[in-house]
C-alpha cells in the first residue's frame, strides 16, 4: 500500500460455522478464521458461540491474538456448541469503542441473535432517526446496531428470522454482507448489489461455513462451495442440517461489487466470484504494461499488494522481475499512528531497499494506489538514494478522486492527491520519471470469471446509491446531503 501513514482500510471481515458432526471446536475454528481475515480489520474482534441454543460471546478492542487469550478461548469452547460466528473490524479513531465491536448479541422476546456486518449503509441516519423516534435506545454509533434493531423489530412480528431479515432488506440501502446466528439457524446475507464479498464452504465432516473470503475457509479445512449471490439469503437450519436459499432480493441488473477487493483488500490466496485474487492482480500488471510501456531494466513491487501486479507487468513486458524492498514484519500499528515525525520516518522503517536490485538501473515501480502522494514520494526517494537511475511509477488502479460510502475508509477527499490535479501535476508531487495509472476500462476486466458488475465510484464519482453521509463510520458524524458537489448517482 502506498500510504503507510494514512492507508485505505476495509471495514470488516465476517465468519460463521455450523458443525453438523459435532467434531469441531467451533470457537477455535472461528479464532483460526479470524486470524485469516485479520487484514480486513485490526481495531476490534469478537466471537459468539451457540451452546445448545444459548448464545454467548466475547468481543473487545485489539487484534485476534490480543483479545482471545487461551483463557478467553477456553471459556467459549463447549462440547455441545455446534455453531459460532466471528468478526474483525476496522473503524476510524473516533469510533474505536468496545460498544461498536461485533458480533452484536441481541436478546428479544423470540430468542437471541448474534449479528456480524461488513459494509456501510447509506441511509443509516434516516433509519436510526426513525427508530429513535419510536423509542429505540442505541448503545453505539455503528450502522450495524441499526440493522440489529430492524431485524429484531420485524422478528417480533413475523414467523421466522429469515422472513424478518427479508423484510429488513426492503428498507436497507448501501453495502452489507451479514452472518447471523439464532438459536437454531446460521444465516448469510448479501445486499442486492453485492458490494462486499461473502462465500459458502463445506466442512469435511458435514456442515457449512460462511466467510468474507475463501482464505478463511482454508484456515478451518473447509472447501469452497460458491459465493453468496447479491441479494441472497442463505439459511442453514440445524434441525435438518440443510442449506436453503431465499432469492426474493436477487436479480438486480446493477450489481456493484467493490473492485478494490481484487486490487488491494482481499488476500491474494482468496478466490472471489470464481476468480483468483492473485491472478486478477497479475492481470492488472499486464494491462499496465500494455497501457504504459517503458524501457527499463527491472520491475519491482511495493510490498505486499504491489507484488502480484509487478509480476504481471514483468511477464507482459519481458522486463526482469526483482525484489526491490524488504518489509519489516515487526513494525507495530502504534508506530504508524504516532507523531508526525514518526509518520515521516514510517516508510524508511517499514521498507528497506535491496540496493543490488536497483543501483544504476531503470526501475519500474508498481503499487496498488496513490492516496495522498507523500508516501509514494518517499518511496521513490528511497530508490533514488539507493542509486536507481530512473523510477517509473505504475499504479494498478485508476486515480482515487472520490470518497467511498460503502465500507472503505478513504481519507478526506481534499487529501486525495488526484483530486483536482492532472497526471503531470500528480507526478510533480511524487517525483517519478513517468507515472501511469490503470484505465477505468481495464480495471473492470480484472476478474474475468465474475458474474457481477463492479463499483468504481471512488474513481469516477458515479454512485449506484445516492450518497448520504460524510466519510466517517460513526453515525453521529454523518449529515444528510453532505457529499462532494461533483458526486453523482449512476445515470445522472
Each PLM stretch: what is its role?
Residues 318-363, 374, 401-407:
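Short, glycine/charge-rich flexible loops or terminal/linker lids adjacent to PRPP-binding catalytic cores
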Residues 140, 145-148, 321-332, 427-447:
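A conserved beta-strand->alpha-helix junction
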Residues 167, 215-216, 223-224, 231-232, ...:
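Phosphate/diphosphate-binding loops
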Residues 136, 157-158, 293-297, 315-322, ...:
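Secondary-structure transition/capping motifs at alpha-helix termini
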Residues 92-93, 123, 187, 195-196, ...:
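Flexible loop/turn segments at secondary-structure boundaries
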Residues 169, 184, 221-223, 227, ...:
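PRPP-dependent phosphoribosyltransferase catalytic core
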Residues 116, 181, 189-190, 201, ...:
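Generic beta-strand/beta-sheet core signal
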Residues 1-230, 235-238, 242-296, 302, ...:
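Conserved short alpha-helical segments that host acidic/polar catalytic motifs at enzyme active sites
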Amino acid at each position: 500500500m502506498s500510504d503507510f501513514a494514512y492507508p485505505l482500510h476495509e471495514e470488516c471481515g465476517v465468519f460463521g460455522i455450523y458443525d453438523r458432526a459435532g467434531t469441531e471446536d467451533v470457537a477455535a475454528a472461528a479464532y483460526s478464521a479470524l486470524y485469516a481475515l485479520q487484514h480486513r480489520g485490526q481495531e476490534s474482534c469478537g466471537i459468539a458461540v451457540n451452546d445448545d441454543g444459548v448464545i454467548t460471546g466475547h468481543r473487545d478492542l485489539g487484534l485476534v491474538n490480543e483479545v482471545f487469550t487461551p483463557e478467553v478461548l477456553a471459556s467459549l469452547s463447549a462440547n455441545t456448541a455446534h455453531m459460532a460466528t466471528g468478526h474483525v473490524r476496522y473503524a476510524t479513531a473516533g469510533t474505536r469503542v468496545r460498544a461498536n465491536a461485533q458480533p452484536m448479541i441481541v436478546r428479544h422476546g423470540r430468542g437471541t441473535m448474534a449479528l456480524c456486518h461488513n459494509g456501510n449503509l447509506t441511509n443509516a441516519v434516516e433509519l436510526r432517526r426513525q427508530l429513535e423516534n419510536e423509542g429505540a435506545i442505541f448503545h453505539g454509533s455503528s450502522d450495524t446496531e441499526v440493522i440489529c434493531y430492524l431485524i429484531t423489530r420485524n422478528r417480533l412480528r413475523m414467523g421466522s428470522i429469515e422472513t424478518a431479515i427479508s423484510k429488513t432488506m426492503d428498507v436497507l440501502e448501501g453495502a452489507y454482507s451479514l452472518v447471523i446466528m439464532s438459536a437454531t439457524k446460521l444465516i448469510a446475507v448479501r445486499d442486492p448489489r453485492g458490494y462486499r464479498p461473502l462465500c459458502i464452504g463445506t466442512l469435511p465432516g458435514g456442515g457449512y461455513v460462511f466467510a468474507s473470503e475463501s482464505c478463511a475457509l482454508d484456515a478451518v479445512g473447509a472447501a469452497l462451495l460458491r459465493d453468496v449471490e447479491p441479494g441472497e439469503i442463505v439459511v442453514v437450519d440445524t434441525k435438518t442440517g440443510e442449506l436453503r436459499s431465499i432469492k426474493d432480493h436477487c436479480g438486480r441488473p446493477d450489481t456493484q461489487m467493490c473492485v478494490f477487493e481484487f486490487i488491494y483488500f482481499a488476500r491474494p490466496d482468496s478466490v472471489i466470484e470464481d476468480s483468483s485474487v492473485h491472478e486478477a492482480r497479475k492481470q492488472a500488471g499486464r494491462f499496465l504494461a500494455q497501457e504504459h510501456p517503458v524501457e527499463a531494466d527491472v520491475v519491482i513491487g511495493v510490498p505486499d499488494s504491489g507484488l502480484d501486479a509487478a509480476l504481471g507487468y514483468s511477464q507482459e513486458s519481458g522486463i526482469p522481475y526483482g525484489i526491490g524492498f524488504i518489509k519489516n514484519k515487526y513494525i507495530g500499528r502504534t508506530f504508524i499512528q504516532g507523531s508526525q515525525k514518526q509518520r515521516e520516518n514510517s516508510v524508511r522503517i517499514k521498507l528497506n531497499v535491496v540496493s543490488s536490485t536497483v543501483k544504476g538501473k531503470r526501475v519500474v515501480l508498481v503499487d496498488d494506489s496513490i492516496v495522498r502522494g507523500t508516501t509514494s514520494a518517499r518511496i521513490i526517494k528511497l530508490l533514488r538514494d539507493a542509486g536507481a537511475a530512473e523510477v517509473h511509477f505504475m499504479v494498478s488502479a485508476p486515480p482515487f478522486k472520490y470518497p467511498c460510502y460503502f465500507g472503505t475508509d478513504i481519507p478526506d477527499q481534499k487529501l486525495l492527491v488526484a483530486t483536482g490535479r492532472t497526471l503531470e501535476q500528480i507526478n510533480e508531487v511524487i517525483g517519478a520519471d513517468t507515472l501511469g495509472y490503470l484505465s477505468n476500462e481495464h480495471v473492470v476486466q480484472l476478474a474475468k470469471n465474475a458474474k457481477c458488475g463492479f463499483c468504481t465510484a471512488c474513481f469516477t464519482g458515479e454512485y449506484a446509491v445516492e450518497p448520504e453521509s460524510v466519510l466517517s463510520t460513526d453515525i453521529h458524524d454523518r449529515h444528510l446531503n453532505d457529499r462532494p458537489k461533483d458526486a453523482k448517482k449512476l445515470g445522472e
